[in-house]
Amino acid sequence: MLLEGVLLVVQALQLASALDLPAGSCAFEEDTCGFDSVFAFLPWILNEEGHYVYMDTSFARQGEKAVLLSSDLQAEEWNCLRLVYQITTPPGSVSDPSQLNLYVRFEDESFDRLLWSTKEPSDSWLIASLDLQNTSKKFKILIEGVLGQGNTASIALFEIKMTAGYCIECDFEENHLCGFVNRWNPNVNWFVGGGTAKNTHSVLPQDHTFRSEHGHYMYVDSVYVKHFQEVAQLISPVTTASMSGCLSFYYQLQQGNDNVFSVYTRDMAGLYEEIWKVDSPGNAAWNLAEVEFSAPYPMEVIFEVAFNGPKGGYVALDDISFSPVHCQNQTGLPFSAVETSCDFEIGLCNFYQDKEGPGWTRVRVKANMYRAGDHTTGTGHYLLANTKFTSQPGYIGRLYGPSLPGNMQYCVRFHYAIFGFLKMSDTLAVYIFEENHVVQEKIWSVLESPRGVWMQAEISFKKPMPTKVVFMSLCKSFWDCGLVALDDITIQLGNCRSPARLPPPPGECTFDQDECAFTQEKRNRSSWHRGRGETPTSYTGPKGDHTTGVGYYMYIEASHMVYGQKAHLLSQPLRGVPGKHCLTFFYHMYGAGTGLLSVYLKREEDSEESLLWRRRGEQSISWLRALVEYSCRRRHQIIFEATRGVSIRSDIAIDDVKLQAGPCAGMEDTTEQSSGYSEDLNEIEY
């Protein structure tokens, strides 16, 4: 049977009966298996003959929701959640189609995390495969249907199944084939082999799982090949959680010299990367292949066979598995993102400098009105080159990163700031060095940059040999030797530019795309504005955002307000939960007439808000980090209130808001604080 996408998932109708389904699963044969409709929304209706639940226009209007909530679940091991569903729309184009969303609700979080969302209509059942990371926390699965436009719109759920393991694993014994799909080609395609399937063109092997003619596997052969380089692709489900480890599978080749069997990854931007290729003709036995696999963001695994002609034989595939440890054939040290990151709050981490020469200097700056502090907190440590101790003409400062394994894609992110008014050519550059400190390549150098603004740089690279990332600062002469600062270095696997598949959780917002789930309360009040760069009024407000230096932040424009006027920015309603929560955000209060910035907790049905945190007056020219800890068992909202000060130099800004479960680390003791800057206005502590 041909595995073209839609035909494959139709076979999901033959999944195991409800009696065999594990916790968090349901086949909707007679009931909803512990999944309950949430009373605040429309109910999901169980079909009279069983088999599925649905919502449609017979009882719902456009925009109305139906929500299904599971009982408490636990997943101490990695799990795969598979959802068989169908969305129907009326014929023709629809501007507002129906939508199906799946959330995870952890017991200690006040918001739900979106795991998957689709508006894809179909005339048959489709299957979604979603990775659930192992956790010690209890959680619930929440499935939300939003009815779209059209008098025949509907959403139906046929089955939910949660099983231990990774979604990219498959032995091809179940009819849904783990969500793997064949990319249809008129001449060559992947087929299901074994069991009752027969093929008159090739003598195909027994499967690997059971070593039996009754077991199943996937295969592709060249019998219908008409042209050179006919290609067949078998595509895995998209990963939905970050993973790194060893991908293994079993394969057989016939006439291996006339075909090419390869494995690729493909991210959501469509970027392919080859991670494995067969290097021998093979034999009439199952061969084990192991390959290092890293998916720091959503991607697919593609098993591809290219035939050179009609005598290209066949390729068979079985028992795809994944382990979060490195392959047995892996040589050298494994990669660790923790070992390759540093905010310089406690020394240089795993970075080091040349032994000769003064090099980079680790410094900190107290909050003041003239010199920016570090990027991490505004008052912490960072590295500074070309200081009064190192600015001799011809000086070169090198900061070496830890060793990185070869043949892997890396993303380097760091923040830098330029100070002074001198020329900046080659003030900061990033090089790739081989293990023996031989220069490989310059991969980045600073261009013109705003002075005193922490800018984020991103660099993607891949080298076949082990390498080190080296940050180099050059002081050519007195007139070409500006101060350069470096902070918050991270090196991670993957491409920096891979697009995000899902929006950030409701508890996080950088304001770079929009205002997220925040809303304004404008009754008798002024407004928060979303802006970038400098604010319109001189000598107040930030020069750039905290996230990247060129992104967006929220601020009040004091020149549009009167003294004492307030602006409110409200979070979305948050669920009450036991335990503490930590609210982290960055604030900017610079200007001689700066007023107040306050954070309030607004409980549902309470007429008054509770003050959680406040700062009064001018604080610093830097973005400063705030940590706010609170508890609330009732439904509530967080309110950011900015109050205009005595003059137009009173712009106040916030950025990078994040809400997390648990207490804050390094919590400040004071709720309210007045002006917080240093009396030593321009002091650098070496």
From Swiss-Prot:
Record localization: Secreted, Extracellular space, Extracellular matrix
For the region Disordered, give the residue spans: 665-686
Please indicate which superkingdom the organism of origin belongs to. Eukaryota
Where does the record place the MAM domain? Answer: 24-169, 168-329, 340-498, 507-666
The alphabetized UniProt keywords are: Extracellular matrix, Glycoprotein, Repeat, Secreted, Signal
One GO CC term, this protein: membrane
GO molecular-function annotation terms? glycosaminoglycan binding
Carbohydrate attachment residues: 134, 329, 524
The name under which this protein is listed is MAM domain-containing protein 2
Originating species: Mus musculus (Mouse)
Gene for this protein?
Mamdc2
